[in-house]
Amino acid sequence: MRALLPTVQETKGSWVGWTGERDGQSEVVHADGIDLYPVPISSQEVDRYYEGFSNGTLWPLYHDAIRESNYRSDEWDSYVDVNQRFAIQIANIAPPHAAVWVHDYHLQLVPNLLRELRNDLRIGWFNHIPFPPLELFQRLPWRSEIIRGLLGADVLGFQRRQGADNFVSAAEHLLDATELDNGLVHFEGRNVNVGAYPISIDVGDFELQASGRAARQRTAQIRSRLGDPEVILLGVDRLDYTKGIGNRLRAFGELLDQGRLDPERHVMVQVATPTREGVEQYQDERREIEQIVGEINGRHSRLGFPVIHYLYQSLPLEELIPLYRAGDVMLVTPFRDGMNLVAKEYVAAHVDGDGVLVLSEFTGAADELGEALLVNPHDDHALQDTIVRAVEMHRHERRPRMEAMRKRLETSTVSDWANSFLDVLIDR
């Protein structure tokens, strides 16, 4: 939402989406300078379409999560119904020959459904999460239907080249589509542009807020309240089993047990934003994480000074930016992630040019932020060693790394991302 809002405002576009509420409103709302067209989703559809097929089937499959996906026909039927409802709403409000940008794995059937309703439209689709290799995608009983749904678009965008290649492989294998030159895929008389468009953030806004007096004062206050430790390690994630929070916490605990980190000098702050709280897998993940936090704090905390400060809450940007600035070492270690904008937000917030980013090699951000300390989060020893290296890194190494990442971000903003995609779409 934060990444897309400036683009919709700048293009004077309309937003079609779900409010996030069961049996929510359907009245048009004008807010933040744009028209919002809600698509109502019933309580049963939330269970089947959203929590069921989208997040119980597609999410773990696309992230290659080590857990079984659900393959239920009633949930697939609900997925089809909701995608059809979105397509109808878009078809009803889109001006002639408008550009329509569909987002994410929840709406993979919309491009072709919309094409059947409004062939005059220029349709783009962007995937915010990984797209899996063929050997994983083939497990899905409705694999061909999803590929056909996506091939209704004019432009298909993925976070990484790897995701785009995986899609092309699936389209060739499952529907006999043909890969042409210049990123085109030919299918049933049409050419579809397939490419990598790595998403970014509003770098200027982050830098402006991070440079402000309020952010500086709040950063100092955070450090003081944490006991002015020598090093603050920071994790900011949605509470999701793909984010590797448990592995990260265990690595920190092991380093304390081994004496490689000192609880009087090194503290950790872990923010876990609530998400999908009605899904059992996420409830289990929360319990496991909170148990790990309790065990480590029980072993290593002093009275009034926990070694891990754990927040299960969503923080506003005005609180998050000072927290980023306070973090000396940022730990972004998901098992797999389409991009991970937290890594970019941390870099943008460090207007002082200091700080160390520890980054999973299985994120899209790793393609762009090569000066981070890249790590395989599945390798416990490598993760521990990388954390220690980050903590001990001298400023003469820290600052050039951070400066290089900051310069790259400044030439790859959210506006650059949106414009690169929309330019291709509008030129079709």
Language-model region placement:
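Catalytic cores of carbohydrate-active enzymes across secretory and cytosolic contexts
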Residues: 1-428
